Amino acid sequence: MEMQVQNIFIVDDNQLMVTDLKLHLQERFGASVKISTFENGESCLKKIDKDTHIVILDYFMEGKNGLDILKSIKEINPKTDVVMLTSNEDIVLAINAFRAGAKDYVIKGASAWKKIAKIIIHIITEPIRILVREFRISKFMAVFLLTFVTMGIIVLFAMYVIN
């Protein structure tokens, strides 16, 4: 099944870290991701829309902090998955982020990029896992059904546009 290109935003004021993470994700996911980067939350909010799938968001930045930006993202598009990224291991910050709708909370460090890649894989494959778990069908059948439904929607849309 061909996966939809995932629009990923990386928001952090540390440009070296942003460049490193972007390269890591591009190497890992290739053409299946489109990555946009932002130095602050305000510039990110101007670009968030219904097609923004994942935001990797630094907690501490100039201007509004990551928690405020997270809340604004969820107001604009509640379906956008937000991964908070921080160097602070404060449990209260993590709890507040989860309460505001964060999908995950990652501490910056040596294994952070691998963890973020695993989170993205988890987000992308969620529909398949739901079908397997809830309807007790094989993974092959779940992929087949999602492909069939997607193709059906495309055909119906094409017929609608033609007429």
For each feature predicted by the language model, list its residue ranges.
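Two-component/phosphorelay signaling modules centered on CheY-like receiver
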Residues: 15-36
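Helix N-cap/capping motif at the beta->alpha junctions
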Residues: 37-43, 66
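Active-site beta3 strand of CheY-like receiver
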Residues: 9, 50-56
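The feature encodes the CheY-like receiver
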Residues: 62-63, 86, 90
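Receiver (REC) domain switch/output surface
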Residues: 24, 115-127
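Active-site residues of response regulator receiver
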Residues: 12, 58-59
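Short amphipathic alpha-helix used as the core "switch/output" element in two-component signaling
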Residues: 65-79
